[in-house]
Each structure stands twice: as C-alpha cells, then as structure tokens.
C-alpha cells in the first residue's frame, strides 16, 4: 500500500490557505517527497507526519515554488537527530542548485546524495537505514520502481512515476511438484536464487503469475506532450497540474507552459488512468472547485486537490 498526502497544492506564490507544491508518499513508515515548495515544513507539522523518516526528495524542476522549502526542511531534519543520508533526485542542474541552497545551512549531521538527470529507471528498497534509491539493474529486489519523463516547461522538468511492485503469490503445490526443499522456500519467495548441491533453484519454481502492482504518476509544470498518455497509462492515481481552471485562460497556459483543467482531463482520459487529482493552482484561482466541471467533462473520476488531501492506494485483487 502507498499513502499519499498533498502537502501543498499551490503554484507561483504561497497563499494563506495554500502552500506551494509538495507531495508526500508514505511507504512502510518511510517517506518520499516530490517537490518541496515554501511552506512544506509547516504542512508536515500540520499533518503530524514527522521529519526524520524522509529519505528521498524528488524535484520536478528548479523553479522557486518547487524548491524554496528545501533548506529549512533539511535543517529541521538535522535537528531531529537524523544521521542517515538523504537522496535528492532531479533534472539537469539540480546539483548546482543544491550547492547554492546548502550554503544557507550549517553543517548537517547527515550526508546529501544527489542523483542528477537519471537516464534509466531507479529502484527503491526499504532497509534498516530507510529507503535507498539507486540506478535499477535487474529490478528483481526493488520494492518501488521510479521512472522519469522529460516535460515541456521553461526549465528542465521531470514527471515522476512510482510503481510499487507486487511479488507473485507463493504456490506450495508448485514448490512440491518441482522438488524444492522446504528449507529454501522463504528465500525463493523473496526473489533469491539458491544453489544447493548440484542444482540451482530459482523463484519461478515456487511462485505463480506476476501480479499487478500500484502505479502513481505525478506531472506538473508542463504543456501536454505526446508521450504523457502512454507514460501515465493505467495509473491508479494520476496527479497533474491544473494551473488554470478556465478554458479562457488557454493563451496564458500556452505562454507560461502550463495546463488547464480541461487539458489535464484529456490526458487522464487518453492515459486510461483510474483517478485524476488536480493540483498546482494559480494564485489567481481562488476557488478551484468552481471549474471542476471543465476537467470532469473530459474525465469523470477527477478530484480537486487541496492542502492536506490524503489517499491510501491499495493493491487490487
């Protein structure tokens, strides 16, 4: 299961009722942030979510409304007795930006690891030191697979996909049929390959068909692109920017490389996602719910996001 919390649903500048862009993903008590706009710390405190367990911060792009919360957050995490490294993932330029942001912070009690402009998939595993993310190799033991998509904005910008892998079901009858010793059943269930005597035992000898996991996709600060529908295909939850609610603001959306509610709904429909959650609202958009119909005309299963929105995403049988 994944638990998602929309910490900030605003774009451009903070508002009294709306912090800037940030999403928290909770997996087995450990946390991933996507973007860290101004107000993220305050939002985390409101949610009683805790700072020490944030292991990974994924940045979509380096515009201020998505990164200005980083220095304060990292400092607070240091004050919470965190000692394990924190990994920051982002597009080209993230390393230079982080060097600048870190100048404002006294020495941290933990290290910062940066993954800049990854070209392939990344794998996340849950360890005793928290969530660890690295370049994916075979993906066999990765619990979450992360992929990025280059978007169309005025700065290098990533969309993020998080796929929570689900192990095939253990089939004891299959294990017995294949003469697999009971002593190694549990290891094979975990994806390990075991050599015993003159025989090699692989997980497929005890496991059934591959089962569908959970897919969460996050896209903000972009114009619609031809690659997005396939990339978000069959997402259980598609979180997408809706900077402009009114279709009359299409010229602004094109000029500023953002999207309208209608365009987000069109992408959700083309991508055959299960649910669309809109976020990243313009400061001029005082009542996003007033324009909900513009998205729902294209995609009925649309929710207007708000600071503090929470959702559990569970496996489907």
Swiss-Prot record:
Its EC number is 3.1.26.11. Zn(2+) 1 binds at residues 61, 63, 153, 221. Keywords: Endonuclease, Hydrolase, Metal-binding, Nuclease, tRNA processing, Zinc. Its cofactor is Zn(2+). This is Ribonuclease Z. Disulfide bonds: none annotated. Belongs to the RNase Z family. GO terms for molecular function: 3'-tRNA processing endoribonuclease activity; zinc ion binding. Zn(2+) 2 binds at residues 65-66, 221, 280. It catalyses: Endonucleolytic cleavage of RNA, removing extra 3' nucleotides from tRNA precursor, generating 3' termini of tRNAs. A 3'-hydroxy group is left at the tRNA terminus and a 5'-phosphoryl group is left at the trailer molecule. Homodimer. Binds 2 Zn(2+) ions. It comes from the Bacteria. The gene is rnz. Gene3D superfamilies: Ribonuclease Z/Hydroxyacylglutathione hydrolase-like (3.60.15.10). The active site is at 65 (proton acceptor). NCBIfam families: PRK00055.1-3 (NF000801), RNase_Z (TIGR02651). It is an enzyme of class 3 (hydrolase). InterPro entries: Metallo-B-lactamas, RibonucZ/Hydroxyglut_hydro, RNase_Z/BN. Pfam families: Lactamase_B (PF00753), Lactamase_B_2 (PF12706). Zinc phosphodiesterase, which displays some tRNA 3'-processing endonuclease activity. Probably involved in tRNA maturation, by removing a 3'-trailer from precursor tRNA. SUPFAM superfamilies: Metallo-hydrolase/oxidoreductase.
């Amino acid at each position: 299961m994944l638990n998602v919390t929309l910490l900030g649903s605003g774009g451009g500048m903070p508002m009294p009722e709306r912090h800037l862009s940030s999403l928290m993903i909770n997996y087995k008590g450990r946390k991933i942030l996507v973007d860290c706009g101004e107000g993220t710390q305050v939002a985390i405190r409101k949610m009683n979510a805790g700072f020490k367990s944030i292991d990974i911060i994924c940045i979509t792009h380096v515009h201020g409304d998505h990164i200005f919360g980083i220095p304060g957050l990292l400092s607070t995490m240091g004050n919470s007795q965190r000692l394990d490294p924190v990994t920051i993932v982002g597009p080209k330029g993230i390393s230079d930006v982080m060097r600048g942001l870190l100048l404002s912070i006294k020495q941290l009690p933990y290290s910062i690891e940066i993954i800049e402009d990854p070209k392939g998939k990344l794998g996340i595993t849950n360890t005793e030191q928290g969530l660890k993310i690295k370049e994916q190799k075979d993906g066999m033991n990765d619990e979450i697979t992360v992929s990025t998509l280059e978007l169309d904005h005025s700065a290098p910008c990533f969309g993020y996909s998080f796929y929570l892998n689900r192990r095939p079901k253990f089939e004891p009858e299959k294990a017995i049929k294949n003469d697999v010793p009971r002593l190694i059943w549990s290891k094979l269930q975990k994806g390990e390959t075991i050599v015993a005597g003159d025989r090699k035992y692989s997980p497929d000898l005890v496991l059934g068909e591959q089962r569908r996991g959970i897919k969460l996709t996050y896209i903000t600060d972009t114009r619609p692109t031809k690659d997005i529908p396939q990339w978000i295909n069959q997402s259980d939850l598609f979180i997408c920017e809706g900077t402009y609610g009114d279709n009359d603001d299409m010229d602004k959306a094109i000029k500023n490389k953002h999207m309208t509610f209608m365009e987000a709904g069109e992408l959700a429909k083309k991508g055959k996602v299960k649910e669309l959650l809109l976020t990243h609202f313009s400061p001029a958009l005082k009542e996003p719910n007033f324009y909900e119909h513009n998205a729902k005309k294209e995609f009925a299963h649309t929710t207007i996001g708000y600071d503090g929105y929470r959702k559990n995403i569970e496996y489907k049988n």
